[in-house]
Amino acid sequence: MKNSILILFLCLCSLSFAQQKVNYKVHAHNDYAQEFPFWEAYIGGASSIEVDVFLKENTLFVTHSENEINKANTLEKLYLQPLKQLQTEGRLRSLQLLIDIKSDAETTLVAITKAIEKQNLDEVEALHFVISGNRPEAKAYSEYPDFIQFDHQNLEDLDNIDLSKVALVSVNYKNYSVWNGFGNMVAPELEKVEEAIAKAHAVNKPFRFWASPDTKIAWTRFANLGVDFINSDKPAEAVSYLKTLDQNTYVNTQQIEVYQPEFKFDYNDTPVNVILMIGDGTGLAQITSGQIANGGQLTVTQLKDFGLSKTAATDDLVTDSAAGATAMATGTKTHNRAIGVDPDDQSLQNITELLGGK
């Protein structure tokens, strides 16, 4: 009995593990440029949020450059205070705040450290403060408090620096590929991209590209390549898409046998039987997807004569399966929810009855 329970437990654990989804992480690039800085990305589910800061007159302004400073937009107001509010209310989730320094590295970093400590956020386990942009040299990373980590941007010195203060490794995507996020990356560039990711993973550090394509195809490719933080200016959309990526992806593990018609008939003979198959929601996209998943072949694609039919219901532009099938089976349009009847709900002959002389 105990053995049976143990086996059942192991089977359930294995099943649970197999069903676990990969937690793809999205980095909200240039979050300060959004209509609602911080909140839009946070509510949207971003795992990492980027904020550019410039130190001027002892104030940390949220801006890309000094000449774009808006005195109402400070690091404390737009980011640190909301984080403190969430922490006080017990609603704070794990988050990486990547602070991209645009002014002098050392003086700005001192101001950032003091600002975080002022809000008592320096010992909050859920928060990870990561310094990017203008940073001190890697050899000076250890001089800063434990709650300050760094976004290292060099793949060539990972074996020579103290990695304990490195939160992630980020590099410019354009140094490795010119792919625009549509179609496929060319093989030589794909190899460079894979090598870059592998270097960071070899030292057990998360990896991010900046200046990377921001399309659904790109998000999918980067997720499959193992990019740990997927860069996006549309974080909520990217999170929503990636959250269902695995369940919306199908991999056919066993090809279905395809029927090969022999076409042994006399074209002058009268057909004896007519087989009318009406697919529900079966268009070119579905046929193409099935064909790709089945190694390029389907039974339906073996037919010599192949056509497409498009119809719309009499009462709506969007046609349901009942009205669509009736139109194709009888040659007469009808309203949605109608099967085998005309718009006045009168019975119709279908094509097999017409051809059979009934």
Say what each PLM segment does.
Residues 1-22:
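Bacterial Sec-dependent N-terminal signal peptides
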Residues 2-4, 17, 122-126, 358:
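Short secondary-structure capping/junction motifs at helix and strand boundaries
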Residues 3-4, 180-188, 314-318:
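Short acidic/polar alpha-helix capping motifs at helix-coil junctions
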Residues 10, 53-55, 66, 103, ...:
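Short glycine-rich, polar/acidic loop-and-turn segments at beta strand-coil junctions
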Residues 12-13, 62, 290:
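Alpha-helical transmembrane segments and their juxtamembrane interfaces
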Residues 19-263, 270-273, 285-287:
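Phosphate-group recognition and catalysis centered on beta-loop-alpha active-site segments
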Residues 252-358:
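N-terminal catalytic scaffold of extracellular/periplasmic and nuclease hydrolases
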